């Protein structure tokens, strides 16, 4: 079996601190959720469940080209959501208030780069989000989603794309950044 990889944009350290502080009392109030660790927060642009060593090399080259052609952009999180929906939540997430179109374009480019590299991309349509928590059994998080809707987090400049390996563990995945690709700062892109 190959490496379990994804491409992503990482939130700024300031946002991680702000959101972590906001969520602290919510974590204590909802123990039925398995809350994700702030150091693992990311906005996935493409997921690849099994990539060979050769595939990683080809993917790395293709992603470097994508990043060089993609201008850095402003991102701001806000609003809550749940998969499949708030009344039967399996995944609780924070949405994107600013930069959604640019993030979606980067996701499409990341996915296309993987396909060009001969790597199978998993997942259905792209829904920009940052996963906050998961539930073993579906629970009603309508109240939490409403609370998340009140967040108007500080924004940041998304200036890199990362290629991450996900190591599966019983007590939450461990993420290892394999490569960082700077997005273009050339305003002509």
Q: What would you call each of these model-derived segments?
A:
Residues 1-189:
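Histidine-dependent nucleotide/RNA phosphoesterase domain, centered on the 2H-phosphoesterase fold
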